Amino acid sequence: MSLNTSTHIENIKKFALNIRKNILEMSVSAGASSAHFGGALSITEIVSILFAYQMKIDKKNPNWEDRDRFILSKGHACLAYYAALCEIGYIPKEELKTFEKNNSNLLGHPVINKKLGIDFSNGSLGMGLSLGIGVAISAKKKKKNFNVYVIVGDGE
């Protein structure tokens, strides 16, 4: 999808601003020692473009078989991921306040939850790229036509 119009650019800026606000709100709610908001803020624009314009997803059906897949290898940046999922309607805004709380679906690293649009768990840093390659190979063998997007950290 083309992002060359001023309307698209403004929409991306608004999407990214909302993600930043949600990142900060979740960080405050969880407590400073629990949230890695710096890493989350560092991927805000990438996540905004992917979820707002690039990825082929169905907001009403997070389990759509032909949806694009997203893997966050640097799982500690999950605040941006959760905020993006909130912006597209997969995670209710109120649920963001439960980040890192007891019985929350929103932990310090993503944990698979198809209802919330989280396809893959993450914990061991550095596993995302190999997982993404495996998902892409599997899709090709099954003759599926979806993309796999992986965000890795600088230490991977």
Describe the predicted segments one by one.
Residues 31, 41-156:
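Cofactor-binding active-site loop characterized by glycine-rich and histidine/acidic residues
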